Amino acid sequence: MKELALGYLRQKAFSDRDKALMSLKLLTENAVGIGDHTTEDFYKNLDEALDLLVDAEDRIEVLGKYYGR
């Protein structure tokens, strides 16, 4: 049970990291859809993606520190 729980937490953290990286890449390299949104929405999306990335990286680090792998 412990391994299943830790596996879930690891996979969720890696998935969130990939999601954040993809969002940041889309926002910084392919921001063609900005015209549909305000710049405030754009900044909010950037902040949310970075927050998700930082959170995911922290979770990956903590899981590695306390549970290995």
Segments from the language model and where they lie:
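Extended, charge-rich alpha-helical interface modules
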Residues: 1-69
